[in-house]
Amino acid sequence: MMKKTKKGRVSWASDSMLCQVKLFLSDDCPVKVASNLPPGFEATDYATKRIISHIPRIKWKRPPLFVLDDALLVGSGGKSIETRSENLRISKVLEAFYPHRSVIPSRPSLTLAVEEEHYDDGKTPNIPLTHVEDERDAAAESSHSFEAPAAVSGLGPELSLLASAALSALTKEQGSQVDPDLLVKLLSDPKIVENLINGMKGKPLETANNSLNTDITEPRLAPQHVTSTTMDRNPPPMPGNVAPHNVPVSVQSSATDPPLPKPNQPMSSALSMNLTLQKPTPVVHNYPLSSGIKVEDSYTAAPLKPSTGDDVVVSEQKTQLLFPCSSWNMNKVPESARTETDPQIRNGNTNRDDQVSAKPVKDLDYFKNLIREHGAVKPATTETNNYKGRVDHKKIVKVRIQKPCMYFNRPKGCRMGESCLYLHDSSKRLWTDVAPPHFPRAKRLKFGS
């Protein structure tokens, strides 16, 4: 027999048994839990309830939208409205085409509103383009300059240029005792200038120079008497139809000779300097134009005989250059026929020691450049005088070993690349264990498919 089972039923409590129960969690704060505590919790006292009720309320303020920091760099005009309107205006402007020049307005860049306005352009200040320093220099030069318009009125164009150049050269020299006013007065009178020119033509060059001496004192060099008279006593044989060329050469230095004028001074001022001109016996050398001249080490002095002839050689210091004049009767050698030693003879540099000292000295950089160009030498050691141990890597020579690189032209290649110390020669095949390249084979035909 089967037992009878009772079904569980839920019945509603009676009115006397009904009560309200509030459920809460232990983590909830006392504010969420109401004052009506459930049964069994009436004895608990919350001390923090009074403290919470007395906390003052803070009024909420809305923070600003942007807080700019002084350290930040903000681009100006990034959100400008005018930029958009300007671009829109430019895009709406149409390009104008004028069929003829007469149709083009006078000033199309100006608007009508600007053309209608009346403005005096004379009120606009002129901005100078020159610097302030240039204006001061120009004012200083104009205050110290001498105005002499009458100085060149009665003279020719060449004489006026020479006179102005001589005046400017004499006034610029420091410690010059030449009176510029007196010089201007003399040059302004054409009669005095003509008399001076005629007097210079009638007298020898020596007396003319002695009459125009200036009181300019300069330090003199020590006397060095060097006169080249013997040059190539046994000249080389001349070819068939080559005529000999005669060149009188004479270089003399004495303590009584004054220094030559500066190169930037004209010839008129050079004539006013104290130049003592003498006529040594010219030595004529016969040599063909196509052959060189051999200078001997021994020099013998030739006697000097002053005369008033046309052939005059200026005696000057050995270390200075000779300035040729049109009155000197010296045979000129054409440019195509000048030899290597011709400039040395004309300049008076006949000493072989001077030629040796003029050669550049080969320093350490010269040999390093040779090593860098030709290679195959060990790199130079680091110099100890480098500042704070720094080494110039450009001067270090990379040595390449004369042995082929075993990784070059392999499938993976050489990792070092151009900086590899071994040779990278693509013409040679450095390995034999590489399989021949695979060529595509023809497809097999399938039968019976």
From Swiss-Prot:
This is Zinc finger CCCH domain-containing protein 68. A zinc finger (C3H1-type) spans 400-427. The keyword Metal-binding applies. GO terms for molecular function: DNA binding; zinc ion binding. Keywords: DNA-binding, Metal-binding, Zinc, Zinc-finger. Residues 335-357 are annotated as: Disordered. InterPro entries: Znf_CCCH.
